Regions:
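Flexible, active-site-adjacent loop/turn segments at secondary-structure boundaries
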Residues: 23, 30, 104, 108
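Hydrophobic alpha-helical core bundles mediating ligand binding, dimerization, or RNAP-core interactions
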Residues: 11, 15, 22, 87, ...
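Short acidic-aromatic active-site loops that bind/stabilize oxyanions
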Residues: 7-8, 84
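Acidic/histidine-rich alpha-helical segments that form the ligand environment
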Residues: 75-112, 124-134
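Basic/polar N-terminal segments that are highly enriched at the extreme N-terminus
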Residues: 1-5
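Short, contiguous alpha-helical
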Residues: 8-12, 16-19, 27-72, 112-153
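Short, solvent-exposed, charged loop/turn and helix-capping segments
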Residues: 25-28, 99
Length: 153
């Protein structure tokens, strides 16, 4: 199995896990947050619905796109259903870009603005959405436990 195929598999599974976690929350709690400085499950899903498009551009062009309209784009995904559909579509497009990524470019490096600036290999970049999905899955599961639901969904 190629590295890219494994990343696609992990990414698709991570998206399914996040969607299942949000679906398990009571509908009236999907936009609930435990504190003013916290993020709701819906807000996190808004990010996950739009972020793959940035990663596609990064993979295709080798540089990070501008985030000029990021907040407005997130806010335009104002329902769970829209976020879920958009996340699936955008992640599908990202998985296409990952699976088509050439082996000989896996060690290429790119500078990213995250964490004050960092350099990552393209192999690491291919896995960023899967990592981000898993990160938010944990946050959503924590919200679930704060609401008294201790089941693994």
């Amino acid at each position: 199995m190629r590295f890219q195929d494994q990343v696609v598999k992990q990414t698709q599974r991570a998206l399914d896990d996040v969607i299942r976690a949000v679906e398990a929350l009571p509908e009236d709690k999907r936009d609930w947050k435990p504190a003013d400085t916290s993020r709701s499950a819906l807000n996190q899903l808004q990010e996950l619905a739009v972020a793959p498009r940035y990663f596609v551009e990064l993979i295709d062009k080798g540089q990070m796109p501008q985030f000029d309209d990021h907040e407005n784009l997130m806010k335009s995904h104002d329902t769970f259903e829209l976020c879920r559909e958009s996340a699936r579509e955008a992640t599908s497009e990202l998985c296409r870009a990952i699976s088509e990524f050439p082996d000989e470019r896996l060690e290429d490096e790119v500078k990213l603005p995250f964490g004050g600036g960092m350099v990552m290999s393209m192999a690491d970049v291919l896995g960023l959405h899967a990592w981000n999905l898993t990160y938010h899955h944990g946050q959503i599961n924590y919200i679930q436990t704060m609401l008294g639901d201790l089941e693994m969904h």
